[in-house]
Amino acid sequence: KLLGWRGAYSGDELGQHDRTRDHLMNWLPKQNTEPIPESLLPDESVRFARNEPALHTNGDLTKSHYDMNLPAIDILFRHLLWTGDLDFAREQWPAIERHLAWERRLFRRPFGTDKLPLYEAYCCIWASDDLQYHGGGATHSTAYNYYHNKMAASVAKRIGKDPAPYEQEADLILRAMRRELWLADRGWFAEWKDLLGLQQT
């Protein structure tokens, strides 16, 4: 069993919603709920190339060196769409909040003087081998975070929580994607944008 495998979507698609729920409940209770460290320096053991200790902090769902939180939470949101199970949504709301805070803390990258957010892709989907990982903003990871903030706002309204922070973040992400990643001359989004240097797409 690996978190984030696409097969976990199939239970709902086949009408076997209990299987998807069972899969999610194998992982969601394991989410890291430890206090958030004040600071975490880059990992010397990998020549400061990444920060594995930071990855495994409050909100993380697995000890993997990938960001498999992202597809797992996507599976959770789509399960809620399939089932309309608001009791399960209420039960898992803290996990959703911790996940979104974890994504913001680790992977949110500010662009422009107004610091609009794109999100770094930290091996966050299984089609990862030919995608960019350089600390900048990537379209697929940013699109996931846009959708998840939209869904969090939608769920929040239905379970009596405040949707405003998630609506605001979704709005900022969409503005960032349109301004920083859209290639008007080609009619599609760039795959990524550098954070440093010339900030090329």
Locations of regions flagged by a protein language model:
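Aromatic-rich carbohydrate-recognition surfaces in CAZymes
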Residues: 1-115, 138-146
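Catalytic cores of carbohydrate-active enzymes
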Residues: 38, 107-120, 134-140, 144-201
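A short, charged helix-loop
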Residues: 124-130
